[in-house]
């Protein structure tokens, strides 16, 4: 797994440094906006993201602001700053800043003929939130791959990622998770597209206090995209568990995306 992480980091660092690009680098494929799955697209956007979860031990809401900027035609960097609200079933509610994340993504292949693309990247999470107050405090590295293709009025996206906790002071084995998801959207109108996602999470390493180690969580996410204004998209959906292995009973996922 260390070799996989090093290979991903090498691609992310080396590929953007190549000065020669194809003539169509200023063109992009306009895939829809999924709710969990990553997009293989270089973006210039400002986004407001909201996630509300209801679990057995209480509720939590995360409101995050993210900016995505292209550094080079095939290299993008994203910074996300979250504000977290925690309302436990027992104990006092808390609120504050969560863990800031920084993501680097490289478009390694794209075909305008087939409307297909592949991207590789890595996300780093900084432990800026308070672990004691339940607002974060996790340092992690997450290499990922994303792919997409458009066929007629349908977009198909998929992504896979491996998250590794790197907190130095954690007792016992640091947690690691494999995430995989796929999303399908139907462009019934230029301003509206219903979507459906399937997401899986498998904890491969870490403690087993909640009984989720080596068990695969499966979630289904129905939702939609709506083009509410020129260059502005609303995405909204509900994440529902399909297995007894779960971290929450449901989650409401949403966001406003502003292209600039």
Where are these regions (language model features)?
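Cleavable N-terminal export/targeting peptides
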Residues: 1-28
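Transmembrane beta-barrel domains of Gram-negative outer membranes and organellar outer membranes
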Residues: 22-260
